Amino acid sequence: MRLGGQIAAAIEILKDIRTHKKPITNSLKDWGMSHRFAGSSDRASISNIVHDVLRKYLSSAYIMDSDDPESLVYAVIMKDWDIPWEKMLSMLKEDLFSPPLPKESVIKSFHSRQLENAPLHIQGNIPQWLQSSFQSYFKDTWLKEAKSLSMRAPLDLRTNTLKVNRCKLFKNLCHYGVHHSSISRFGLRIPATKGKSRLPNVMNDITFQRGWFEIQDEGSQIVSNLTAITNSSQILDFCAGGGGKTLALSMLLNNKGQIHAWDNNKSRMAPIVARIKRAGIHNVQLHSSWESLRNLQEHFTTVLVDAPCSGTGTWRRRPDIKWRLSQKNLIERTEEQKKILEESAQFVRPEGYLVYITCSILPEENIQQINYFLSKNPHFSIDSIIDDWNQLYDLKNHPSLFIENGCCVLTPFLTNTDGFFFCRLKRHT
């Protein structure tokens, strides 16, 4: 397929997403099933266009003075893929599969409208109703934070030191253009792509199949490391999901101690068994029911709550959820988080730790949840992570890190990671 066919496909998929309110992955999969002739490189280019449109939805609609899928796609190709209008015209001229060109008025808008004149939430590509949350949390840098969430994300890998060291893994993966992560001691990074370029499918690499690494954002690696630094021998991963942090904790404990993994949504835990086997882990105990946890109250030195959340910190990778999030959804999530914190606290032994993590950068899901929990549970208090951060990473090397009341916030703008909130609470006798 040439560019014209890829543009036409992206427009078709965006219409499907809008009409049927589908997740982006479902629409891409459905299109691929009905267009089997499309090669892997074509599918990657089409996926890039669709993701870029949803990342920059508001700003693209503003400069084109139109939010129809055709205009949005052309805006991304010209502005973000850096293909000028005249060059694109020549590329599409003889392509039989090219869609109709935008109206002259739309192209005129593209050349005349200046994004700096747009309302700030449009410049930041975030829903207008969330602007106040960003402003209250990040103050003068809120717009930079918002803009950073509309960029492409790199591909981060976590070395599994149970099987290999980072130096050896780096040598085996150097042909992918990897480099060392800037913060995580176990991380390797493949930089974000531009235009039609795609990230490599590293899961096909023999080193992945041998269990030498896991795909894990650097931010997730960092919060896992901060969780493990307490040297707890008994850890409960209360919202284990697919097991990303469970596996990281097992590695950080060098396969010693015991990690219990549980999740209220059993389907989310489906991948964990195969991942545990591939990683060579044998200190993880899986729980399939709430009843199996009941006898373990006040048993754990650390309880990790990687709480279900809005996912605002992952917008670079999942831009469609940005536009599906509503005030009602956020309220429902915060109520769920309150319940989970209360449920998980009963498993923390005296002088133990309750670690609260979200992949959100909204205060409603983060520090406000902590303050609410502490108001109901005075036998817990915030245990500052500043000294531990300095021990692991040296705060002087990361002066922009956002630390509030001893808790930390990671963001694409501050740490070049996904957005995360980390808070460690200590239970007192």
Describe the role of every protein-language-model region:
Residues 1-429:
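S-adenosylmethionine
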